[in-house]
Amino acid sequence: MIEENKHFEKKMQEYDASQIQVLEGLEAVRMRPGMYIGSTAKEGLHHLVWEIVDNSIDEALAGFASHIKVFIEADNSITVVDDGRGIPVDIQAKTGRPAVETVFTVLHAGGKFGGGGYKVSGGLHGVGSSVVNALSTQLDVRVYKNGQIHYQEFKRGAVVADLEVIGTTDVTGTTVHFTPDPEIFTETTQFDYSVLAKRIQELAFLNRGLKISITDKRSGMEQEEHFLYEGGIGSYVEFLNDKKDVIFETPIYTDGELEGIAVEVAMQYTTSYQETVMSFANNIHTHEGGTHEQGFRAALTRVINDYAKKNKILKENEDNLTGEDVREGLTAVISVKHPNPQFEGQTKTKLGNSEVVKITNRLFSEAFQRFLLENPQVARKIVEKGILASKARIAAKRAREVTRKKSGLEISNLPGKLADCSSNDANQNELFIVEGDSAGGSAKSGRNREFQAILPIRGKILNVEKATMDKILANEEIRSLFTAMGTGFGADFDVSKARYQKLVIMTDADVDGAHIRTLLLTLIYRFMRPVLEAGYVYIAQPPIYGVKVGSEIKEYIQPGIDQEDQLKTALEKYSIGRSKPTVQRYKGLGEMDDHQLWETTMDPENRLMARVTVDDAAEADKVFDMLMGDRVEPRRDFIEENAVYSTLDI
């Protein structure tokens, strides 16, 4: 025991000040980049652009910039130009260096602190410019200010030379050019134009009257777009509803400021059954909602009920409409600008400032009440839509209760058609939704029974985009899926209760299979979106061809853009001597026996699966509505623009 204590004492003595590492300047950023930009993959790479653009947006919010330009240069570097006041170039008192140098070399240096520079700002609260500098092989900045052009260059965060004047000018603004460091971004340094363009368009919607341009100068990829929306978030709502039938033409728009907090709301009702509410705080998309959404939702419900009762559209003895009722078919965008936003939630995308509830509630209530009084015909349409939604909700509740009595939604009594797995480990378990009883039989026989469950579905499930809640709950196939997953439904939905963390859609490789897949994805997106956002949803990729020599299949060809090239290569490969390979075309899963289905599509060692993600919720919402909604013309236009007529199932 004494010897052990001596050993322990020796170990303790070895841990002294010499073992404490102090990272100077921006070394910490290069050592742990994920702490500052989230990741070093594609998302983190594009985050660099937003940090610089956010600084330019701050100038626009302060009223000093009207045009921002973003360039993807020919060498895949980025240039951001604005016509603001230009970053200060005079000496910063604390560092004794020019302010522009301090901004790019010192963490938490910028005009976002103390309230003296920017009243409202977005981004990472001042760390942005220096972080981008630290994670770039080269960064240079040009400041157009006081009639002079000031220039400074940096390499991997370090100053190359002092700030110098390189010319004269009669304009003001800042130009930042940087090249991401491949030592940091090992996965990719290639910028995705569509990712940048979508966010830039969103920023233009959120900042009324600000022009933002994006230009791609890369060889063979040249393109440019210019975004300017005088209607601001009102234009955003019109954009979101572009392919939908609206109840009234012009979106309701209101803006106001209280206690230094600015609130904007735009909203419009459509004939659909889905709600689309998007919220932002200081231009940051608050995916998880927050106090601004709380204030808006409460005001919307209260004002509509008050109007309905006062105008006797709802009788005094009738129940009030719920929030769910009044939001059916609603498209709304809420944007707040706060001098000191507090973000919470799992991904820090939930606004937490408690005072925002009452401010949003009050500002929106006053404007919405006024709108309803001034537009009685539109007001009646809004209330009547809520009443119809209420009736459907009550019918759905009755259907749910009847179903529960029959144990249809009780996990203790799983669907009879479900072939469950033996494991209780949700992290390992997989649920395959299989088209047809024939393929379902092969899948049940071929699966690994320990962790793979099979749920066969018959034919095409209900198109939930066109259905009311009571009809959805009355559909046996949909009920079976909810019950099997164990997540509950509607207000009771809880993704943490998912019995499987892989939900695999496995359909035939033909037009009908694609349609069933789309119907299932629509259901999941509309009513099980947390499962999608958690990354649990996959699409199986069964082979489309088998290359046979004699009776033996030598190679399977997976579906894809290059499937015909793959097939041609395989045929050449096995055309040796007298052997003549033949091609077996798999139109249906039922054409494969259980061993083949396991080997090609279900075996984790060999299979190919596509994970379904939602990178752009607004775009996803538009596409689902267009593909699965009532209007035929937008759907036909989309198919004509995007169809690839390489193979036809006739």
Curated annotation (Swiss-Prot):
Superkingdom of this protein's organism: Bacteria
Cell compartments where the protein resides: Cytoplasm
GO CC terms of this entry: chromosome; cytoplasm
Keyword Disulfide bond applies: no
Uppermost EC category: isomerase
Domain Toprim: 429-543
NCBIfam families (UniProt xref): gyrB (TIGR01059), PRK05644.1 (NF004189), PRK14939.1 (NF011501)
Function: A type II topoisomerase that negatively supercoils closed circular double-stranded (ds) DNA in an ATP-dependent manner to modulate DNA topology and maintain chromosomes in an underwound state. Negative supercoiling favors strand separation, and DNA replication, transcription, recombination and repair, all of which involve strand separation. Also able to catalyze the interconversion of other topological isomers of dsDNA rings, including catenanes and knotted rings. Type II topoisomerases break and join 2 DNA strands simultaneously in an ATP-dependent manner.
Further facts: Few gyrases are as efficient as E.coli at forming negative supercoils. Not all organisms have 2 type II topoisomerases; in organisms with a single type II topoisomerase this enzyme also has to decatenate newly replicated chromosomes.
Protein name according to UniProt: DNA gyrase subunit B
